[in-house]
């Protein structure tokens, strides 16, 4: 048995790291341990975003997580699906169906830093109906302010260029009247520190660097059960990912901060099963198209060794707005986009951009992840079965989004292909499976602090806590909620508070 800790955090991604940091800021006397199932890819800076590394160093690390990648160009979304570098599909795709049933694009990252070691770093604030009324507006604003400071959110990640000026002018021409009174189109808020060499992208290392007391991370350690008696967690049981050795770690509180699939999996395996566990699984349907922008390319020569996502060209967005724009739009020159587009062979000096439109989805209880105890995984955790699909209204919104991006591509210059709806799960933005609520009525898994209903000291953090239909990237929201969870845990343990069930 390991030495006891005050708080054990399961998962080292942006949410788990933010919980740990907030606890240390408020109650530095509390001991906090982060446990991560995957390996440490960047030992010199655990949890660093691998986009900060040269391409030659980055690829072996990504392959270490996801395995060998397909040879040759694979346009993203082509079936059968292959996991993008640094991720692993929840299930192998057989290429059947239209890609919208069962979330075939769903994937996860098992490494120190979680998905935060590979992400594109978009951190816009949600607005309107995207925000849950479980929290008041002042509570949201306070949490967002802390989250933005942790992630180093900025709209000045890239210097202005002729290409970015042309894109932004076109966006404002198309959307200025439509978004009157709402947030305008503009530079995308990104999690990074601008430098003369380009942005330094935020990872878990960035978040934890601000902790007043170092937070240890134990990698290669799979948590297979939370030990609890009468709603009170006493610690966790772990399995060494390499040797299979089992160990128990006593803890006064446990925070489950995995993704929206594996967090409910662990709760289920631990016998912690609120009625809504795994239900209301919510992805963001994603429509993409490519366009050539009518502006001369200034810097045509690009170092072949450079990551094309990291050259200074800019990322713009068209915000979600209730009643006016039911989508979250991203316009990213291909060097900044995580999606690979097919580009024809003809020579064209115009910059190529990718348009990615994220849609709000009908949130339904029947969209869910359920667990099969009879078919456990390699570590003994229950098998995962995803039940998920689009409604008629979702498909109508997809058709509308396709028309919108096609028209915008024409306004920018030239559309290069037909708009495409990516397979469900491709956004990697799935939410809702451990959703928060105001009351324990069977429709949510936790309260507004992340404490799981029916428990004294088990908390959840991450995208899965978000209960609403959202279009914008969820990381900032997840970190904001994680900040509140850290505050609640610190207050409960440091203050000796025992909350009633």
UniProtKB/Swiss-Prot annotation:
**Which cofactors are named for this entry?**
FAD
Q: Name one Pfam family in it.
A: Lycopene_cycl
EC code: 1.1.3.50
Name the InterPro entries on file. FAD/NAD-bd_sf, GMC_OxRdtase_N, GMC_OxRtase_C, P2Ox-like
> What does the entry report on temperature?
Optimum temperature is 30-40 degrees Celsius with carminic acid as substrate.
Binding positions (FAD): 36, 109, 111, 115, 120, 122, 223, 463, 475
Alphabetized, the UniProt keywords read: FAD, Flavoprotein, Oxidoreductase
Q: Tell me what reaction this enzyme catalyses.
A: carminate + O2 = 3'-dehydrocarminate + H2O2; isovitexin + O2 = 3''-dehydroisovitexin + H2O2; isoorientin + O2 = 3''-dehydroisoorientin + H2O2; mangiferin + O2 = 3'-dehydromangiferin + H2O2
- Root EC class: oxidoreductase
Regulation of activity is described as:
Activity is inhibited by Ca(2+), Zn(2+), Co(2+), Al(2+), Pb(2+), Hg(2+), Cu(2+), Fe(2+), Fe(3+), Sr(2+) and by the thiol reagent p-chloromercuribenzoate (PCMB). On the other hand, Li(+), Na(+), Mg(2+), Ba(2+), Mn(2+), Cd(2+), Ni(2+), Rb(2+), Cs(2+), chelating reagents and the thiol reagents 5,5'-dithio-bis-2-nitrobenzoate, N-ethylmaleimide and iodoacetate have no significant effect on the activity.
Q: How is the cofactor bound?
A: Binds 1 FAD per subunit.
Q: Where is the active site?
A: 429
As one GO molecular function, the record gives: flavin adenine dinucleotide binding
How this protein's activity responds to pH is stated as: Optimum pH is 7.6 to 8.4 with carminic acid as substrate.
Region Disordered: start-end pairs: 74-106
Q: Write out the function statement from the record.
A: FAD-dependent C-glycoside-metabolizing enzyme that participates in the degradation of certain C-glycosides by catalyzing the oxidation of the hydroxyl group at the C3 position of the sugar moiety. Shows oxidase activity toward various C-glycosides such as carminic acid, isovitexin, isoorientin and mangiferin but cannot use puerarin, orientin or aloesin. Shows weak activity (100 to 1000-fold lower) with O-glycosides. Probably plays a crucial role in the metabolism of C-glycosides in nature.
Which protein family is it in?
Answer: Belongs to the GMC oxidoreductase family.
Please give the PANTHER family that the UniProt record associates with this protein. PYRANOSE 2-OXIDASE
What does the subunit section of this Swiss-Prot or TrEMBL entry state? Monomer.
Know the name of this protein? C-glycoside 3-oxidase
């Amino acid at each position: 048995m390991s030495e006891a800790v005050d708080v054990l955090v399961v998962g080292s991604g942006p949410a788990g790291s933010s919980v740990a940091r907030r606890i240390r800021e408020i109650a530095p006397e509390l001991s906090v341990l982060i446990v991560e199932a995957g390996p440490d890819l960047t030992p010199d800076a655990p949890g660093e975003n691998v986009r900060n590394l040269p391409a030659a160093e980055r690829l072996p690390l990504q392959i270490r997580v996801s395995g060998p990648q397909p040879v040759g160009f694979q346009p993203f979304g082509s079936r059968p699906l292959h996991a993008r570098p640094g991720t692993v599909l929840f299930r192998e795709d057989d290429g059947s169906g239209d890609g919208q049933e069962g979330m075939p694009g769903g994937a996860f990252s098992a490494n120190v830093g979680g998905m935060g070691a590979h992400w594109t770093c978009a951190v816009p604030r949600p607005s309107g109906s995207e925000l849950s009324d479980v929290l008041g507006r002042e509570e949201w604003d306070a949490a967002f302010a802390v989250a933005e400071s942790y992630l180093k959110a900025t709209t000045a990640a890239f210097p202005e260029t002729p290409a970015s000026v042309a894109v932004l002018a076109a966006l404002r021409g198309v959307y200025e009247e439509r978004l009157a009174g709402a947030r305008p189109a503009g530079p995308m808020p990104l999690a990074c520190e601008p430098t003369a060499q380009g942005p330094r992208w935020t990872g878990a290392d960035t978040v934890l660097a601000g902790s007043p007391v170092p937070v240890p991370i134990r990698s290669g350690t799979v948590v297979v059960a939370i030990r609890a008696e009468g709603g009170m967690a006493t610690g966790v049981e772990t399995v060494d990912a390499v040797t299979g050795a089992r160990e128990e770690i006593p803890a006064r509180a446990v925070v489950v901060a995995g993704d929206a699939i594996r967090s409910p999996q662990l709760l289920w395996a631990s016998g912690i099963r609120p009625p809504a566990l795994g239900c209301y699984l919510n992805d963001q349907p994603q429509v993409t198209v490519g366009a050539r922008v009518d502006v001369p390319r200034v810097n045509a020569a690009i170092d072949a060794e450079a990551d094309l996502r990291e050259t200074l060209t800019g990322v713009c967005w068209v915000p979600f707005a209730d009643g006016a724009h039911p989508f979250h739009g991203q316009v990213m020159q291909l060097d900044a986009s995580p999606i690979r587009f097919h580009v024809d062979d003809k020579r064209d000096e115009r910059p190529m951009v990718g348009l990615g439109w994220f849609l709000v989805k009908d949130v339904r209880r029947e969209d869910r992840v359920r667990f099969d105890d009879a078919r456990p995984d390699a570590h003994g955790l229950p098998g995962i079965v995803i039940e998920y699909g689009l409604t008629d209204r979702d498909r109508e919104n997809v058709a509308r989004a396709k028309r919108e991006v096609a028209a915008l591509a024409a306004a920018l210059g030239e559309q290069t292909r037909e708009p495409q709806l990516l397979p469900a799960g491709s956004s990697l933005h799935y939410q809702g499976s451990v959703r928060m609520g105001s009351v324990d009525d069977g429709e949510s898994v936790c309260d507004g602090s992340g404490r799981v209903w029916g428990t004294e000291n088990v908390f959840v953090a991450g995208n899965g806590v978000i209960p609403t239909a959202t279009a914008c990237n969820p990381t900032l929201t997840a970190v904001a909620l994680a900040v509140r969870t850290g505050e609640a845990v610190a207050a409960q343990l440091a203050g000796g508070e025992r909350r009633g069930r």
